[in-house]
Structures are given as structure tokens and as C-alpha cells.
Amino acid sequence: MVVLMAYVDALFDTADWFRQLWAESLGKEKSTDGRVVETGPTPIAARGATDQHSQLQLYVEGPRDKVVLMLTARQRETEVVIPDGELTRSRDEYRYLGDRGMGVLLDAELRGTIGSLTNRRRPVGTIELARVDAPSLGALLVLLECATAYAGPLYGVDPFDQPGVEEAKRLAYAALGRAGFEAKDLPPIVGEGRYVL
């Protein structure tokens, strides 16, 4: 499994796009020489720090079958500052937050997550953009596309076809009655011999 965890909200769509790219390019039944291999790492798009709190336990102590890649940017568009007010001054457990930007808080969360994975000897890496802008995003997309293209031969599959997706399209065309597509391989729809809950 490959987890791409975006620590900048503007980069989450890129993590989501990577999930689609990696899944359709590397999830294959057959190798390039025709052998049945049923291979491909499961891609997971995650949003740090939200998914850090919902998924990190699994990544730190669960099966050792994941590589976690952090996606962040050195320069953020806007910085929301936590005011140094009554709450941060009146309670010791909040005092350290006063006058700190949310970027500082997210960076600390990122460092903590990387540290917890590293301390448990879990594979983790970081991709840091200078900023979230067109040149940086373009470079990131090319990097992820190249990584996918190079991973195909490592798994012994062609990363440039998607026969599983094509089959689903053909079956959908058949279900819609499109000329030239037969419905003989269609499964029954819900209610036709299947349990409905």
C-alpha cells in the first residue's frame, strides 16, 4: 500500500488524483508476459492532520505493508494565527498555542507523524514543494507520472493500459443497450436474486 498524505489542503486533490493514477496503472491481473499475477499496491489518499488522527494507529502498529509519503509545501498561501487570548493564557494545556500560525501547528503535526513512523521503522518519505503554484504542481504531477511509469516494470505489468476499467465500460454499455455490446455477462441488479438490506 502507498499512502500519499497531504499536509496542505490545496494538495489533497493531487493525492486523490495519484490514487486513481496508481490504481489504474499498476493494479493488474496479468504480467507483461501473460502470467496471472494479480498485483498492484493499494493507493490511499489521506489528509494530514485529519487522517493522521484516524489512520496513523494502523500505519504505526498495524501490518508492515505500507509506504507513507508526506506531501507538503514550504510556503502556504494564507496563515491563520491562533490568537493569544483568554483561552490560551488561562489554561496551561493551551498556552503554547497563543500567537502561533496554523502552518506552524500543521508542521509540528507532520514532524510528529514522521517521527512516530520512523521510530517504529516504518517506511516514510516527504515530498516538499516550494509553494503551491502551477510550476510546482506541474513538476509534482510529472514526478508522480514518472514514478508510476517506472513502477510498472518493477511489478512486471504494463502501466499504460487499463483492461479492468475497459471491461466495466463494456458491461455498462451492454446494460444500456448500446449496439455492439452483449448483455450476456452482466450480473443481476439488486433485487434480482441478490439480498437487499
Predicted regions and their residues:
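A SIS-like phosphosugar-recognition module
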Residues: 1-197
